[in-house]
């Protein structure tokens, strides 16, 4: 423990640490002397006793005796008592008057509030804008009249009759979708469907000498398949020359992935 320097933990004034004689900072022992309440109380007691001593000497002196006799002749004590009594009576009378006034104000009936109607100023009338009583509004010469006609929907029975009178349609009412389209048959629905094939050429077989006759083999008829649509292949309209600038322009991404690591040594 002796090797540890505690000066870095002490309060400082600039670069100077407060240690040793400065350990009493924040206590009652301030710089310049101790602050003691007992010394203050003893000083007040000494001051009071000194005043009492001088007052007793002045009251018992000859001048004090003459002053007392003069005050007795003028009835000073009675005047002081009368003044105090009159002051107290005046204060009591003022308070009593204030209380009586408050009580009287509360007991008095409140007068009924009279509702006064506000008189509005007369409206300013523009001549010719509003027709007076007894006058009719002039009718314009070319006044348009609108006539509306309402058409009611047919009844249920009439709608059924109109629907039965219409001939059924043999064609689709909407535009067909090619993958889902089917043939719509008309009146001749029972006629069987036939597949018309082109005539096949007759095969010609050469008869070699001394050959054995070979039985004719039936040839299967080939059915024509629908033509396959060519598949569209995307091609560049303006092919650029393959250089490093076009390669950089065609690169899409966020760039080189980098990773930062902070290490403490």
Swiss-Prot record:
HAMAP family the UniProt entry points to: ADV_CAP6
Pfam families for this protein: MCPVI
Region (Interaction with hexon protein): 48-74, 248-254
Name the record gives this protein: Pre-protein VI
Region spans: Amphipathic alpha-helix essential for membrane lytic activity: 34-54
Motif Nuclear localization signal positions after renumbering to this chain: 136-140, 260-263
Sites marked Cleavage: 33-34, 254-255
Naturally occurring in which organism (per UniProt): Human adenovirus A serotype 12 (HAdV-12)
Keywords per UniProt: Capsid protein, Cytoplasmic inwards viral transport, Disulfide bond, Host cytoplasm, Host nucleus, Host-virus interaction, Late protein, Microtubular inwards viral transport, Phosphoprotein, Ubl conjugation, Viral capsid assembly, Viral penetration into host cytoplasm, Viral penetration via lysis of host organellar membrane, Viral release from host cell, Virion, Virus entry into host cell
Motif Nuclear export signal mapped to chain: 67-76, 246-257
Binds to importin alpha/beta, involved in hexon nuclear import, as annotated region: 255-265
Modified residues (Phosphothreonine): 148
A GO CC annotation given for this chain: viral capsid
Keyword Disulfide bond among record annotations: yes
